[in-house]
Amino acid sequence: MKKRAALLVALSLAVVTVLAGCGGKDSSKSADSKDSVATFEEKKEGDTFTVGFDQDFPPMGFVGDDGEYTGFDLELAKEVCDRNGWEFNPEPIAWDSKDALLKSGEIDCIWNGFTMNGREDEYTWSEPYLDNQQVFVVRADSGINSEKDLAGKTVDVQTDSSAEAALKDNTELSSTFSTEIIPDYNTGFMNLESGAVDAVAMDIVVAKYQIESRSAEFKILDYEIASEQYGVGFAKGNDAVKDQVQKTLEEMAADGTLAKISTKWFGEDITTIGK
């Protein structure tokens, strides 16, 4: 019995030792993973440059009539790739998943009417290349002529958008109406056109394009919810690729390419680099 008891004790101690050893390895691996820091390197000729964008955000990025991705921002990004010898890869994303995709490295940047203001410390940014305002769009025959007329009305706003953030910051105004969160602004304009909502809060650059491309009559209220700037957003710390893109954008501004692309999409040069 004593021998049997001694054997059982020895076996128990061995099991505890093994388990403790396993636990130590798992803890170390978790700590290493938690403390690991992503490293960033410059892109080389032949590398792929993946741009994350919302495919329902014309004229910045969307699906053209030919089924191909197109838009002002995508055209800028492609020109940057062509000049650096990179393979351009436009990657449509769900806007509320952009941060996870950027941090995981599945996309190199967010380039899609991406507002810098209020996000300065969350990403590594290019210099601003476009000014923008958040505004309200209503039906021309709605009888809504100012932001005060929105009291008691319903306003569409895209999820995780700058317009949503601006309205949250302006509770004195936003508390006077109801907001409805939508996945994209194409949905917002369909709701507005059908009368399901009374207004859409959105980027003025996108609003003007949407209004021109639709048969229904809309108007932009003479009220600025917020003023902001667009930039190219990279993962925090990715100065290497950001600097490459910034340098190329400055070259495009100097030789007139930025102005040419802007005029194609907006009828005039509204870019801000080098000005």
Name each model feature, range by range:
Residues 55, 131-138, 204, 208, ...:
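Periplasmic-binding protein-like
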Residues 74, 89-101, 179-194, 228:
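Short helix-initiation/N-cap motifs at beta->coil->alpha
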Residues 17-21:
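C-terminal motif of bacterial Sec signal peptides marking the signal peptidase cleavage site
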Residues 23-25, 74-83, 141, 154, ...:
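Extended ligand-binding regions for polar small-molecule ligands
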Residues 97, 113-122, 168-169, 193-227:
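A ligand-binding cleft/hinge motif common to bilobed small-molecule-binding domains
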Residues 27-69, 82, 143-154, 275:
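Immediate post-signal peptide segment of exported/extracytoplasmic ligand-binding proteins
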Residues 74, 78, 87-149:
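Acidic, polar ligand-binding/catalytic clefts
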Residues 55-58, 69-82, 114, 135-189, ...:
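Bilobed "Venus flytrap"/periplasmic-binding protein-like clamshell domains
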